Regions:
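Generic detection of intrinsically disordered/low-complexity segments and helix-coil linkers/edges
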Residues: 16-19, 23, 38, 53, ...
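Terminal, non-catalytic protein-protein interaction segments that mediate quaternary/complex assembly
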Residues: 1-3
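N-terminal "first-domain core" detector
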Residues: 19-44
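Short, solvent-exposed polar/charged micro-motifs at secondary-structure junctions
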Residues: 35-36, 66-68, 119-121
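Residue microenvironments linked to proteolytic maturation
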Residues: 5-16, 21, 72-168, 173-175
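Residues at the C-termini of beta-strands that transition into short coil/loop
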Residues: 28, 61, 137-140
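A glycine-rich, hydrophobic loop/mini-helix early in the fold
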Residues: 43-86
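Short, charged/polar surface micro-motifs in flexible loops or helix N-caps
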Residues: 31-32, 62-65, 88-90, 116
Length: 175
């Protein structure tokens, strides 16, 4: 089994609330990163259903530095969607929250091990078909240039975010 401790994918933080709650994508499918890896739909499915422990929310992939909790995590058509909460009693989580609000911190990254992959003969990229997810981290320097926070909304905008997510889910279900 090949171990891979970190990899960054496009992140879209859809909301950041005053109490530290956030929602967004920790991994986006079909996006080639700087390490020539492409996460494919379904890659997280087995790992998420077989979990015996929660996915950790870490600072910069540092196992000794948890900064919050993941409340919900699942695959949709776009990628790996997460909802979490920074624990603002933790100093590093408060700093991360301030950096996110100021848009100084822009990346999310995942720690995982590769269970099944194949090489794309045309592009040379490694397509990740099955991974075991260990953790989600807030990071300052993601491996993928597209791995950045695109939207940070205030608490009053959270209802708009939820409505947009519901509309997106409705489109997927009606297909």
């Amino acid at each position: 089994m090949e171990r891979k401790y970190r990899n960054s994918f496009a992140l879209e933080v859809k909301a950041l609330m005053a109490d530290g709650r956030f929602a967004g994508y920790a991994s986006v499918f079909d996006n080639t990163d700087s390490q020539q890896d492409v996460m494919r739909r379904g890659a997280f499915a087995k790992s998420l259903t077989a979990r015996r422990y929660p996915v950790q929310l870490l600072w910069q992939h540092q196992w000794q530095n948890p900064i919050g909790v993941i409340d919900a995590i699942f695959e949709d058509q776009h990628g790996l969607y997460v909802e979490g909460k920074l624990l603002l009693d933790v100093a590093q989580a408060r700093e991360a929250h301030a950096l996110l609000k100021a848009k100084a911190l822009r990346g999310l990254s995942i720690g995982y091990s590769v269970k099944r992959a194949r090489r794309n003969p045309d592009s040379g990229a490694r397509e990740l078909l099955e991974v075991e997810l260990w953790e989600v981290s807030l990071v300052t320097q993601p491996a993928n240039a597209a791995a950045q926070v695109t939207v940070v909304k205030a608490e009053t905008d959270y209802c708009d975010v939820l409505m947009a997510a519901l509309r997106g889910a409705e489109r997927v279900l009606l297909r």
